[in-house]
UniProtKB/Swiss-Prot annotation:
Protein role: Ligates lysine onto the cytidine present at position 34 of the AUA codon-specific tRNA(Ile) that contains the anticodon CAU, in an ATP-dependent manner. Cytidine is converted to lysidine, thus changing the amino acid specificity of the tRNA from methionine to isoleucine.
Species annotation: Clostridioides difficile (strain 630) (Peptoclostridium difficile)
UniProt-annotated binding residues for ATP: S27, G28, G29, P30, D31, S32
GO CC terms: cytoplasm
Gene3D superfamilies with a match to the protein in the record: 1.20.59.20, HUPs, Phenylalanyl-trna Synthetase, Chain B, domain 3
Gene Ontology biological process terms in this record: tRNA modification
UniProt entry keywords in alphabetical sequence: ATP-binding, Cytoplasm, Ligase, Nucleotide-binding, tRNA processing
A single MF term (Gene Ontology): ATP binding
Chemical reaction(s) catalysed: cytidine(34) in tRNA(Ile2) + L-lysine + ATP = lysidine(34) in tRNA(Ile2) + AMP + diphosphate + H(+)
EC number: 6.3.4.19
Compartments, as annotated in UniProt: Cytoplasm
Organism placement in taxonomy: Bacteria, Bacillati, Bacillota, Clostridia, Peptostreptococcales
Comment text on domains: The N-terminal region contains the highly conserved SGGXDS motif, predicted to be a P-loop motif involved in ATP binding.
SUPFAM superfamilies associated with the record: Adenine nucleotide alpha hydrolases-like, MesJ substrate recognition domain-like, PheT/TilS domain
Official protein name in the record: tRNA(Ile)-lysidine synthase
């Protein structure tokens, strides 16, 4: 019965092709032992090579050593090449700040990929079953998840990780092992309700089965499978939109154009953000729905220059026209400069890669000129002492129509990104600020009906 069911799953989801080289995660428990036995029976039909990999987590002492001996003997009897590795998982988790579940899973998969690369295999087979599927969906519901989380465990992931017994129930697996006298090892920690998954397996699902629906496992999985095709379609659309709205400059950096992003449906937005994080980290582990919602809140124009920090050192910055996601904090390095400016001539500001050009002329000539936004004019007779162009300083103020305003507050009002503020030149005379770049002119130096001479300043990029 199981053999036919597994073969059907393999064919339906195209999990194995002739000539595949497969690394099988072998814990010694019923699931992985059943999977090994079934694939070994299929070995000749598919012309596949099977290699087994076992990790001793150094958690269960002598029992863990017995597990390793058991799987070693099992592989020897079947003629399967066997790899074993021993790692102090508790110590690793303590150093990395991970739970035992998270750390053990991470180390197992690292070992699987290491062996896969070493022997040039192309598949990794994992013994997840139907009950695991239901437990995973329930865990994600309680943690908070979207449609992608509800679709549960994939039959195949990254064109590499396959789960051939995902349609098989745990009790069927146990019966199979008994029928073939496989005598798998039983991890007693799986019988202790100290982990979230164990509590779902041992307490929640049995309670639901006894009090609500005797077929609750099948119902959860059926729901999960029905959502999968919907999710797959949306994911495909989201991937295309991600490419359209994102500027991917380098590994670890994604900039999302807000004009395009805000027009998307929320279902697509969520996936665009997840794709952004996946581009940076390689996956979206430990980034859940609330983190995605926090990023989406940055659409609001009142959030310009806000910054978020997500798990695994993802930094999110709201710029004027974009949202930036990166794995490196953007450090604002202050640029300092100070130059005396001639009344007529030009000066090169190498720190800004700009040329500042100055010219004194009559008011009539000034009014006859066609000026663009890069030019500013001031009443030359109101200028006191020499003209200086410099970087901003703490406490800088400029006189505006409504009174004096701190330059820092002016930058905030103008929504100038924090890292750009140090690049805006401040032009002063001996009495105060004449203008802040080409953004604002002080009321004290503006042209009026009494102006006879104008100081024209041009801000030109090199």
């Amino acid at each position: 019965m199981i053999f036919d069911k597994v073969l059907s799953t393999i064919n339906k989801h195209n999990l194995i092709q002739k000539g595949d080289k497969i690394v099988l995660g072998l814990s010694g428990g019923p699931d992985s032992v059943c999977l090994l036995h079934v694939l070994n029976r299929l070995k000749k039909d598919f012309n596949i090579e099977i290699y087994a990999a076992h990790l001793n987590h150094q958690i269960r002492g002598i029992e863990a050593q017995k597990d390793a001996l058991y799987v070693s003997k099992l592989c020897e009897d079947m003629g399967i090449i066997f790899f074993v590795k021993s790692i102090n998982v508790p110590k690793y988790c303590e150093n990395e700040g991970l739970s035992l579940e998270e750390g053990a899973r991470k180390l197992r998969y690292e070992m699987f990929y290491e062996i896969k690369d070493k022997i040039k295999a192309n598949k990794i087979a994992i013994g997840h079953n139907l009950n695991d599927q239901a437990e995973t969906v329930m865990m994600r519901i309680m943690r908070g998840t979207g449609l992608k989380g509800l679709k549960g465990i994939d039959y195949i992931r990254d064109n590499c990780i396959i789960r051939p017994i995902l349609d098989v129930e745990r009790n069927e697996i146990e019966e199979y092992c008994e029928a073939y006298n496989l005598n798998p090892r039983i991890d007693k920690t799986n019988l202790e309700n100290i982990y979230t998954r164990n509590k779902i397996r041992l307490d929640l699902l049995p309670y639901m089965k006894d009090n609500f629906n005797s077929n609750v496992i099948e119902s959860i999985v059926r729901m999960s499978n029905s959502l999968k095709s919907d999710n797959d379609y949306i994911e495909k659309e989201a991937e295309a939109k991600f490419r359209e709205v994102s500027n991917i400059k380098e590994k670890g950096f994604v900039e999302i154009n807000l004009d395009d992003f805000v027009c998307l449906h929320d279902a697509i937005k969520v996936r665009v953000l997840r794709n952004s994080i996946k581009h940076i980290l390689g996956d979206t582990n430990f980034v859940d729905q609330r983190h995605i919602e926090d990023i989406m809140s940055l659409e609001d124009n009142s959030k310009v220059n806000k910054m978020l920090t997500l798990p695994r050192n993802i930094f999110v910055y709201r710029k004027k026209d974009s949202i930036i996601l990166t794995n490196e904090e953007i450090v604002n390095e202050e640029i300092e400069f100070y130059y005396n400016v001639p009344s007529n001539g030009f000066i090169k500001i190498k720190e800004l890669k700009q040329i500042i050009e100055t010219q004194v002329m009559s008011i009539d000539r000034y009014k006859s000129m066609k000026l663009d936004n890069s030019s500013k004019g001031f009443d030359f007779n109101k200028v006191k002492g020499g003209i200086v162009i410099r970087s901003r300083r703490q406490g800088d103020k400029i006189k505006l129509a409504m009174g004096s305003k701190k330059v820092k507050d002016l930058f905030i009002d103008l929504k100038i990104p924090r890292e750009e503020r140090c690049k805006i030149p401040i032009i002063t005379d001996s009495e105060g600020i004449i203008c802040v770049g080409d953004y604002k002119i002080s009321e004290n130096y503006k042209i009026d009906e009494n102006t006879k001479e104008v100081l024209k300043i041009n801000f030109n990029k090199l």
